[in-house]
């Protein structure tokens, strides 16, 4: 049997043929089978097609940074309709894209304009923000500023925007369901990434590549292989982080393309460890993804405080932010059946490297995934295990095409190295002596102090090991003497007292003294994004504004 490339709807159709009645999407109030979701997403696709959305130009007619398909903005918190919107758009050969609903209206408007959105599917409570973003009133054809609007009732009591169609109404008419186009592996998967990288960028993946490079598929997959995996099923996957970020989407699709049930956590409210653990217990979750210490710490505290049956949970994936060694150890002691998988990757690469920890054995280095490598500092060659040069993480093979509408960034981030198209997301790394890699972080997360380079994540890890420190971030700020100085922003545990000097000595006892912070700022709360990722913009601003709590470098 000849292997073939796959679009995501084609894979899901194979899974649905094998297990139509299996739960596919589950939330606190909704439970839908694979067959139900296939019907609903076909109806949504037909609705989008009737309103003119679809493919404009085929992939072979376009350059790497160009999109020839209609785009659909998804402005929602986690819910089954989020993934149904994505799959429905794929079936229409349109391209869904994530919008961070925490953005200000100006930022949302800029993103919709940048991507060229033709439709917006939104939670009703976010409707006023969407309307403000586009700044126009409804038109007779039911569009705002030319946008097709579909609203999802989130129970907020907020009225839909004028001219908007409710999600159930969009699905009510099955006209055109049997005339849908056949999605292509060349159809796009678009991830809009921002966070620590600044202005949002649209990362363009082919679906055939994202299926293998980010969603757990394989180059050798045939229909029989996919069907065989689907019959067994992948268990129950819990996507706890927000789907408005690529990592959670890929967790969800990795579960779905392997025939699993995906459980969604309502992220419209603050992180609730008790609700998370109750969900694991109720749904018998087998695999869950989290984002670093921001998720791990409250989970550990809640497991210690109350009794839960978490014996079904055998795998915990963590990425997007550092999970400290102490918290991993606590999770493994509390849940001895657990395997903790630290993942490293980016929107520009998919999963690149993994470290696996079990009870009694913690991984301290990453092992490279297929296609992942370390590039030399000058980006001219691939390093080999044994080289001690600090270079760049890189990936070849199943990687994105480029950045939407940005030729310059596309050619910078996806260069040719040794004749191979390569993704270089911007993280520094080196090989370890045993062939693993040590990821050192982005150049933007490096403080150059007195000619020495300090990778902030390394210092943050040590700070979080202190028993009195709840959370910490490290940044650089200008220094007349050293060019830059290391600044630690520290959140103490309730009731704890700690002097800046003792914080510095704690770091200096485990790392080179030049890596210890010259300034320590005690903060009531560390700034983090909704995903749990560090808010370094907040941290740098706080460091620049502070004029006290400086200790002398020795």
Q: Where are each of the predicted segments found?
A:
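Conserved AMP-binding A3 loop
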Residues: 33-35, 188-216
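Conserved AMP-binding/adenylation subdomain of ANL enzymes
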Residues: 214-236, 244-287
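Gly/Ser/Thr-rich phosphate-binding loop
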Residues: 168, 285-290, 301-364, 369-371, ...
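Conserved ATP/PPi-binding loop(s) of AMP-dependent carboxylate-activating enzymes
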Residues: 380-415, 452-454
């Amino acid at each position: 049997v000849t292997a073939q490339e796959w679009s995501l709807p084609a894979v899901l159709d194979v899974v649905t043929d094998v297990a139509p009645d299996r739960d596919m999407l589950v939330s606190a109030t909704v439970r839908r089978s694979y067959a139900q979701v296939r019907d609903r997403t076909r109806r949504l696709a037909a609705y989008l097609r009737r309103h003119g959305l679809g493919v404009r130009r085929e992939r072979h007619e376009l350059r790497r940074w160009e999109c020839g398909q209609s785009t659909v903005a998804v402005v929602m918190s986690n819910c089954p309709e989020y993934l149904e919107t994505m799959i429905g758009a794929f079936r229409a050969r349109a391209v869904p894209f994530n919008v961070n609903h925490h953005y200000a209206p100006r930022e949302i408007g800029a993103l919709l304009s940048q991507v060229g959105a033709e439709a917006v599917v939104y939670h009703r409570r976010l409707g006023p923000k969407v309307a403000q973003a586009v700044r126009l009133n409804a038109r007779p054809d039911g569009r705002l500023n030319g946008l097709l609007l579909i609203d999802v009732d989130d129970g907020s009591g907020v009225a839909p925007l004028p001219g908007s169609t409710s999600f159930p109404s969009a699905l009510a008419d099955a006209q055109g369901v049997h005339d849908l186009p056949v999605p292509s592996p060349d159809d796009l998967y678009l991830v809009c990434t921002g966070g620590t990288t600044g202005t949002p960028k649209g990362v363009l993946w082919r679906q055939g590549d994202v299926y293998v490079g980010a969603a757990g598929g394989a180059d050798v997959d045939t229909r029989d292989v996919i069907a065989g995996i689907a019959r067994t099923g992948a268990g129950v996957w819990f996507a706890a982080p927000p789907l408005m970020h690529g990592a959670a989407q890929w967790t969800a699709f990795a579960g779905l393309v392997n025939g699993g049930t995906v459980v969604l956590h309502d992220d419209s409210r603050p992180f609730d460890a008790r609700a998370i653990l109750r969900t694991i217990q109720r749904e018998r979750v087998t695999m869950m993804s989290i984002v670093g210490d921001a998720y791990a710490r409250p989970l550990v505290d809640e497991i210690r405080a109350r009794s839960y049956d978490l014996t079904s949970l055998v795998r915990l994936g963590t990425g997007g932010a550092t999970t400290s060694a102490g918290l991993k150890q606590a999770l493994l002691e509390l849940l001895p059946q657990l395997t903790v998988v630290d993942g490293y990757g980016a929107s520009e690469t998919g999963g690149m490297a993994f470290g696996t920890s079990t009870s009694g054995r913690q991984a301290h280095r990453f092992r490279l995934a297929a296609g992942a490598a370390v590039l030399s500092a000058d980006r001219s060659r691939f390093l080999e295990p044994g080289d001690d040069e600090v270079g760049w993480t890189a990936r070849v093979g199943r990687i994105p095409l480029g950045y939407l509408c940005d030729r310059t960034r596309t050619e910078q981030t996806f260069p040719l190295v040794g004749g191979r198209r390569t993704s270089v997301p911007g993280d520094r790394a080196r090989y370890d002596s045993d062939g693993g890699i040590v990821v050192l972080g982005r150049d933007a997360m490096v403080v150059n102090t007195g000619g020495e380079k300090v990778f902030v994540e390394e210092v943050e890890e040590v700070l979080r090991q202190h028993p009195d420190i709840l959370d910490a971030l490290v940044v650089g700020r200008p220094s007349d003497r050293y060019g830059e100085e290391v600044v630690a922003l520290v959140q103490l545990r309730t009731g704890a007292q700690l002097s800046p000097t003792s914080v510095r000595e704690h770091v200096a006892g485990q790392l080179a003294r030049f890596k210890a912070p010259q300034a320590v700022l005690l903060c009531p709360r560390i700034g983090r994004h909704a995903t749990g990722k560090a808010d370094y913009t907040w941290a740098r601003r706080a460091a620049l504004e502070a004029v006290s709590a400086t200790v002398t470098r020795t």
